[in-house]
Amino acid sequence: MFLLHEYDIFWTFLIIASLIPILAFWISGLLAPVSEGPEKLSSYESGIEPMGGAWLQFRIRYYMFALVFVVFDVETVFLYPWAMSFDVLGVSVFIEAFIFVLILVVGLVYAWRKGALEWS
């Protein structure tokens, strides 16, 4: 309980980081002119009238590819701090990180075998 003052900078940053986008949306909502009409409700495609329907179905393969990318992108987020403090943490954290990477490699092999990485 006595160490809570060490987090004052964190809470201040969190509050400011939350208030900036809220204030930006609120101020733009107050100052922006409101114009409604058929031209405002129509689709816009590079300055020309849209051709065809706007709703397209994407193949599930794109979603699987994106999901695999996000998983390994998050892996990088977790491994970067570990790599920066590798010499301080010791062997036990190295073993934990190795197990983490091993689990992700098993997941990558599974996704590869299932064809989630095939683009064609």
Curated annotation (Swiss-Prot):
Disulfide feature: none
EC number: 7.1.1.-
Localization (cell): Plastid, Chloroplast thylakoid membrane
Class of enzymatic activity (EC top level): translocase
GO cellular component terms, semicolon-separated: chloroplast thylakoid membrane; NADH dehydrogenase complex
A GO BP entry: photosynthesis, light reaction
Alphabetical UniProt keywords: Chloroplast, Membrane, NAD, NADP, Plastid, Plastoquinone, Quinone, Thylakoid, Translocase, Transmembrane, Transmembrane helix, Transport
Bilayer topology annotation: Multi-pass membrane protein
Function: NDH shuttles electrons from NAD(P)H:plastoquinone, via FMN and iron-sulfur (Fe-S) centers, to quinones in the photosynthetic chain and possibly in a chloroplast respiratory chain. The immediate electron acceptor for the enzyme in this species is believed to be plastoquinone. Couples the redox reaction to proton translocation, and thus conserves the redox energy in a proton gradient.
Assembly: NDH is composed of at least 16 different subunits, 5 of which are encoded in the nucleus.
Full protein name: NAD(P)H-quinone oxidoreductase subunit 3, chloroplastic
Gene source species: Lolium perenne
